[in-house]
């Protein structure tokens, strides 16, 4: 199934920044606690984007690891390459489309991560099989993605504002079902871990910034709500009205990110 999706650097980084400023928990520390990555490991991050996970592993392992990041988005990869240059290009960055055979050898990595990316695959079983192929026997796959109850407030406000059905999201609509099943079928065992991070907005501006970045980043997914810039701005004004009313009534907006972390062993 082809996913209509377009990711941009500015929108992605805006959401990451808002998570940091308004969330009460650090997902990076949660990931490190779960995985306990070891020095000397070979690590691959699939769908690495601007390199966030690669640089996290590089820092915590003090550079003592063979780290590779791959992505199909050239804009985000260029951002990663700019950051990589600052550390002497210690991370290998490659063009990698997870809808195609990975340009990598079998049994190569101790740890393969794919954070908030795998659900954009057009053929989930194929992508999982490629991940399985390049992981060493006994190695691990770690994926993250939104669970069905993720940021319920966000969708409730959009529905109240537009009175239009929320389109199915590639993540929350199939991460805990189709993707989890595909991983179970190909790996020896799978652990499920849940991360919850309440984002608290005491005024409407950061919530609107998050919403604007989300709708803009995923604009191909939201095409049933607006067709052009004028339609987008009209929807944003409707959302502004509803969000402002809710803050006036309750004093704040609390939007909880609910993320599933799957750890699979080959």
List the predicted regions and their residue ranges:
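Class I SAM-dependent methyltransferase SAM/SAH-binding core
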Residues: 42-46, 50-100
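A short acidic, Gly/Pro-enriched loop at the edge of an enzyme's catalytic core
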Residues: 102-111
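A short SAM/SAH-binding and catalytic strip from SAM-dependent methyltransferases
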Residues: 111-123
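A short glycine-rich, Lys/Arg-flanked "PGG" loop and its adjoining helix->strand segment in the class I
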Residues: 125-137
């Amino acid at each position: 199934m082809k996913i209509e999706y377009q990711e941009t650097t500015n929108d992605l980084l805006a959401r990451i920044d808002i998570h940091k400023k308004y969330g009460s928990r650090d997902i990076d520390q949660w990931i490190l606690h779960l995985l306990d990555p070891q020095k000397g490991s070979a690590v691959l991050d699939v769908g690495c984007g601007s390199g966030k996970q690669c640089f996290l592993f590089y820092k915590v392992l003090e550079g003592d690891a063979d780290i590779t990041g791959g992505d199909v988005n050239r804009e985000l990869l260029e951002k990663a390459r700019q950051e990589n240059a600052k550390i002497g290009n210690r991370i290998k960055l490659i063009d990698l489309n997870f809808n195609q055979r990975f340009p990598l050898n079998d049994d190569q990595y101790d740890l393969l991560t794919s954070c908030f990316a795998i659900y954009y695959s057009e053929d989930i079983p194929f992508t999982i099989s490629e991940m399985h192929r390049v992981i060493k026997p006994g190695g691990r796959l770690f994926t993250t993605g939104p669970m069905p109850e993720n940021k319920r407030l966000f969708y409730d406000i959009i529905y109240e504002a537009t009175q239009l059905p929320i389109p199915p999201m590639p993540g929350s609509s199939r991460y805990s079902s189709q993707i989890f099943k595909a991983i179970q079928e190909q790996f020896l065992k799978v652990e499920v871990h849940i991360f919850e991070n309440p984002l608290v907005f005491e005024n409407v501006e950061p919530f609107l910034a998050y919403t604007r970045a989300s709708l803009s980043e995923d604009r191909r997914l939201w095409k049933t709500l607006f067709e052009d810039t004028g339609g987008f701005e009209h929807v944003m004004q409707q959302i502004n009205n509803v969000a402002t009313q809710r803050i006036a009534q309750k004093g704040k907006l609390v939007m909880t990110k609910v993320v599933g972390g799957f750890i699979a062993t080959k």
